Regions:
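Soluble non-transmembrane domains of integral membrane proteins
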Residues: 1-160
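Channel- or pocket-lining gating/hinge segments that regulate access to a cavity or pore
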Residues: 157-286
Length: 287
């Protein structure tokens, strides 16, 4: 993946060309969602053979950057459906591409993934499935062609690749630091005490608590900004709720420590004084 909405794909596309096809048609294909520049798209005819019965076989090697909308709201438990749309070279000719299933060697194409190198590096994803289907595409124009019938519910061939994200990487990069921060917060909260000997032994003071909370908040904000930059075009993703909860936990520890030290009277002061701030410490994890 180049970024959250652009992925790189390379491969070979072939066509078997029957001699019975109209002479007005030419072999070739179009990837309508490709980003076509000198650096992002390559297409080269690498073989051309004549098969039995006069049928022609053409094969192209291609490299392309494809732009496609992706849903990241369930990150890191999300999955991706990459759709490689394929059109005939004369897309206005009302021709429909048909998958060449006979050229795949796997016996059960419904159960097995096909059409993709098993050694491919998927950058944090696992291959779940591949299959062909048709997209019923509609347009509000005939593009100037009087006999064009592809404007309404016209089938376009799509090669689909389903990817499942590897949760382990996301856990180590994003969730594990949050867990460490929460443990440090809880450890900081355990130092809140009214016992003079414990306060002296643990060097407890409200300034230390506020400084610790500020440092942990800064660490989380940096990680959160890096995550948001990664999914800048996406609405809030699932893992971001853990950051929001962590911000709340930081405020909770700082506010509790200040109130415990300064508000020794009243209902809140009495609740916090019970068993040396036991209620607030117990409520930390549910928060």
């Amino acid at each position: 993946f180049e970024n959250p909405v652009v992925f790189n794909v390379t491969g070979i596309i072939w066509q078997k060309w029957s001699p019975d096809l109209p002479a007005s048609l030419e072999p070739g294909f179009v990837l309508p969602e490709k980003i076509e520049t000198a650096d992002t798209y390559t297409e080269e005819l690498i073989y051309e053979e004549t098969l039995d019965g006069g049928e022609k076989l053409y094969g192209w090697y291609f490299e392309a950057h494809i732009r496609q909308s992706m849903d990241y709201t369930e990150f890191p438990f999300d999955h991706k459906k990459i759709e490689l749309r394929l059109l005939p070279k004369q897309w206005q000719s009302n021709a429909v591409l048909i998958p060449d299933f006979d050229s795949y060697l796997k016996k059960d194409l419904l159960a097995d993934s096909f059409g993709i190198d098993e050694r491919i590096i998927l950058d944090g994803y696992d291959l779940a499935d591949t299959y062909f289907d048709y997209l019923r595409q509609s347009y509000d124009t005939n593009f100037g062609f009087p006999n064009y019938v592809g404007a309404e519910e016209f089938p376009e061939l799509i090669f689909n690749i389903h990817l499942q994200r590897s949760v382990e990487n996301a856990f180590i990069i994003y969730l594990f630091p949050i867990i460490i921060v929460l443990l440090l917060l809880f450890g900081t909260m355990l130092t809140v005490t009214s016992d003079a000997q414990k306060r002296e032994r643990m060097d407890f003071n409200i300034s230390m608590i506020i400084a610790s909370c500020s440092a942990l908040f800064f660490i989380l904000v940096l990680a959160h900004v890096e995550l948001r930059d990664r999914f800048i075009t996406s609405p809030i993703v699932y893992i971001e709720y853990f950051y929001l909860l962590s911000y709340g936990a930081i405020f909770y520890v700082a506010a509790n420590s200040y109130i415990f030290c300064e508000a020794r009277s009243g209902m809140i002061g009495k609740l916090l004084a019970f068993e040396d701030n036991l209620l607030a410490k117990t409520a930390f994890w549910p928060s």
